[in-house]
A protein has these predicted regions:
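Intrinsically disordered, low-complexity, mixed-charge
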Residues: 1-93
Length: 93
């Protein structure tokens, strides 16, 4: 049986103003991952992801590549317990 996990992910680089959040949302839907993504005031992007471990890992790997016009310098991951409280993946503000 596959394990459900959660992850808090911080992405650094040229990740704001380059459609990173919208593309992350699209990728999350493709992987079946739920949660949210938002810009931070420090220029980074933060996401909270939940789903099957392999799907969350795939979305984290996607974040390392980013959207076509972004430049990802670093991806920091903090694994969390699966809460099950999300039903979709949203861009938040």
């Amino acid at each position: 049986m596959s394990e459900h996990v959660g992850a808090r992910v911080i992405i650094s680089g040229k990740v704001q103003g380059v459609f990173f959040r919208a593309e992350t949302q699209k990728a999350a839907k493709g992987y079946g991952v739920v949660g949210w993504v938002r810009n931070r005031t420090d220029g980074k992007v933060e996401a909270l992801m939940e789903g099957l471990r392999g799907d969350v890992e795939a979305l984290i790997a996607w974040c390392g590549e980013g959207s076509p016009v972004s430049r990802v310098d670093q991806v920091d991951v903090q694994w969390k317990e699966y809460s099950g409280k999300f039903t979709r993946f949203e861009v938040t503000y």
